[in-house]
Curated annotation (Swiss-Prot):
Membrane topology: Multi-pass membrane protein
Subcellular location: Cell inner membrane
Cell membrane as UniProt keyword: yes
This protein's GO CC annotations: plasma membrane
One family name in Pfam for this protein: TrkH
Domain of life: Bacteria
Keywords, sorted A to Z: Cell inner membrane, Cell membrane, Ion transport, Membrane, Potassium, Potassium transport, Transmembrane, Transmembrane helix, Transport
Function statement: Low-affinity potassium transport system. Probably interacts with Trk system potassium uptake protein TrkA.
One annotated GO molecular function: potassium:chloride symporter activity
Name of the protein in question: Trk system potassium uptake protein TrkH
Keyword flag NADP: no
Length: 482
């Protein structure tokens, strides 16, 4: 393992990350909210630390191995999450403790969207902008990580997807080099962001809200510049725009690349993941709208409007809200919350276990049922017309087993801090799936949870964002052997 190379890369990343504190400084000066000094100090600390890591090792040249990639991926999010909390601690405007500042920073960068802050409408504009920017940067990093980096390490949904699943991406990479792939993905990501912001402005948002919400929409993050989230605007047009861009961002960015390159949209309907996600959301919308129509005071159109928005927002793991879904009748809150466990497509900014894994788990389950009926039959698991090798099936079940085990351990850990069962279950689920909104005592915000519970949930956010194995492998003795 090349420690000097890792320090060189992390130092460079920190210095680059420090530049992201320049826009909040400009926003602070524009709105004269007095927050610019804190961002200047945070910038200085970040760039100084990065320089101390980079400069002594700037001439280090050594080929990185797979295990170095795992460590860099985990440290990338951990280090940026810690340094990203500096402005939130230094401003004092949100009155955040170090624990709360770290929680908010990790929630932003992992695009979870869980918040410990109350009175968001009263925050200075620089802080509001910074929270939204954290999610946008996190979303951009996730796309590159999921599509360009994790597959080279052999983990992540796209590693399964690109090697074994039929469709427009079969047997091909987006571009020959990771650098070129990253540039292509960033171009698409930025284009979607600008388009989303312009659409929000056309629907009635001011430029500041439109920019901030476009950041968290394309990133499927869920942070808002208002306590009431998207519901603050009370606009069907804004809700429709938000739902549309959440759905687009929940599709694999590899599909967007192919659609952009070939100038046609048929790939979305040929792709097994995209088709499953569209059918899954349509089914949930029908169930939710009918349930609201039968059991609540919503008028038919209002119930449909809220059903469409909340289903898309929760199921894609964004967590925006126009209504408090936790108060909806019957099993609807539980149903919507569980939908987030499915999440977005592999290679998207969405969280959850990823659609491709759910498809494979369902198909393997059906295969075992058929084997009970026909014990001697050789039954292949197929996606489209292509058989999925048993190694892929084992990888999916391995991920699912690790997911369930870690969920249970963190659930017990959060409950041990004194949190009730419903709140503990939902907060672990919301953070591990990078959803944000929870049920129980954390349905409004996470601020009242014990500090130890918040640190456990920070770990859950990181595990969910890095698709578990990227972090878990670091704690195996074999990883550290020479």
């Amino acid at each position: 393992m090349s420690l000097r190379m890792i320090l060189r890369i992390l130092g460079l990343l920190l210095m680059m990350f420090s530049l992201t504190m320049v826009p909040p400084i400009l926003i602070s000066l524009l709105f004269a909210d007095g927050m610019w000094q804190a961002f200047v100090v945070a910038l200085g600390i970040t760039v100084g630390t990065g320089a101390l890591m980079y400069l002594p090792n700037r001439h280090a040249r050594k080929e990185l191995r797979t295990r170095d990639g795992f460590l860099i991926a985990a440290l990338f999010w951990s280090v940026l999450g810690l340094f990203g909390s500096l402005p939130l601690m230094l401003t004092g405007a949100a009155a955040l403790s170090p624990t709360d500042a770290v929680f908010e920073s990790f929630s932003g960068l992992t695009t979870t969207g869980a918040t410990v802050i109350t009175g968001i409408d009263l925050l200075p504009e620089a802080i509001l902008y910074y929270r939204q920017q954290l999610q946008w940067l996190g979303g951009m990093g996730i796309v590159v990580l999921a599509v360009a980096i994790l597959p080279t390490l052999g983990v992540g949904g796209m590693a399964l997807y690109r090697t074994e699943i039929p469709g427009p991406l079969k047997d091909s990479k987006l571009t020959p080099r990771i650098t070129e792939t990253a540039k292509a993905l960033w171009y698409i990501y930025a284009t979607l962001t600008v388009t989303c912001a312009l659409a929000y402005m056309a629907a009635g948002m001011n430029w500041f809200d439109a920019l901030g919400h476009s950041f968290s929409t394309v990133a499927i993050g869920g942070f808002s510049t208002h306590d009431a989230s998207i519901g603050y605007f009370d606009s069907a047009a804004i809700e429709l725009i938000c739902s549309a861009f959440l759905l687009i961002s929940a599709f694999s960015f590899s599909l967007h690349f192919v659609a952009w390159r070939e100038r046609r949209l048929t790939h979305y309907f040929q792709d097994p993941e995209a088709r499953f996600l569209m059918l899954f959301l349509a089914g949930l919308i029908i169930i939710t709208s009918v349930s609201l129509w039968l059991t609540s005071d919503y008028e038919t159109l209002q119930g449909l409007r809220h059903a469409v928005f909340e289903v898309v927002s929760i199921a894609t793991t964004a967590g925006f809200s126009v209504a408090d879904f936790s108060t909806w009748p019957g099993a609807l809150p539980f149903l919507l919350f569980v939908a987030a466990f499915v999440g977005g497509c592999s290679g998207s900014t969405g969280g959850g276990m990823k659609v491709i894994r759910i498809i494979l788990i369902l198909k393997q389950g059906m295969r075992e049922v058929m084997r009970l009926i026909h014990p001697s039959a050789v039954i292949a698991v197929k996606i489209g017309k292509v058989s999925v090798p048993d190694g892929i099936a084992q990888a999916v079940w391995g991920f699912f087993s690790a997911y369930v085990l870690l969920f249970f351990l963190m659930l017990v850990g959060v409950m041990a801090t004194g949190v009730d069962q419903v709140t503990a279950w939902s907060t672990v689920g919301a953070t591990l799936n990078n959803l944000g909104p929870a049920l129980g005592e954390a349905s409004a915000h996470y601020g009242d949870l014990p500090s130890l519970a918040k640190w456990i949930l920070v770990v859950a956010m990181l595990l969910g964002r890095l698709e578990i194995f990227t972090v878990v492998v670091l704690f195996t003795p074999a990883f550290w052997r020479k």
